[in-house]
């Protein structure tokens, strides 16, 4: 089970939002590259970046901070990025800069042809981010709820050739209410590609619960507010996940 620290970027700073509200941002660091180093030094094996300004603007907005993070840790672990990725040129530029994966969210739902083209052109590097509430997909930085069932879209995007799916329960994100295990497992069972859980991770009990269902196809979990607030010790959590995996394999 990969525990993946999230670095959310707003105006060049590392922040956390409460339920996706740009007006409810807590600044955790003015040096995102140093924050990336912090998590790698504590055992992170992948990083999850979000260009928040980009997500709302529909185009890249934190490229300097993103490049600084890649320069700091990109040679050691995979780095994935979402937010504001709406065209193939942006994907190509980011991959050339050293990103391992780009995450397509709103654009995948609104323009499936773009996702299909991206998967064809950059196979193995495209992750789809599906944000949902009560099983329905949301777009545009969570501001719009669609009528699409998350499992239906996930199967469609799997057919296009995406590498994996990040599933965020937006009713829980940034609220420390616990991962929605049931909904995440339901999605993982609907597809054959890996699912990465997101939204609401709060403590070691959540890690244990996720590890119990890892074999359903859940590859990892995005770690957000809990590792910044101190509710979850990242290094201890990754160690626990590794130990549980080893005991399962034994």
UniProtKB/Swiss-Prot annotation:
InterPro entries: Aldolase_TIM, His_biosynth, HisA_bact_arch, Isoase_HisA-like, Isoase_HisA-like_bact, RibuloseP-bd_barrel
EC code: 5.3.1.16
Biological or metabolic pathway of the protein: Amino-acid biosynthesis; L-histidine biosynthesis; L-histidine from 5-phospho-alpha-D-ribose 1-diphosphate: step 4/9
One GO cellular component term noted in the UniProt record for this chain: cytoplasm
GO BP of this protein: L-histidine biosynthetic process; L-tryptophan biosynthetic process
The organism's place on the tree of life at top rank: Bacteria
Name listed for the protein in its UniProt record: 1-(5-phosphoribosyl)-5-[(5-phosphoribosylamino)methylideneamino] imidazole-4-carboxamide isomerase
Gene: hisA
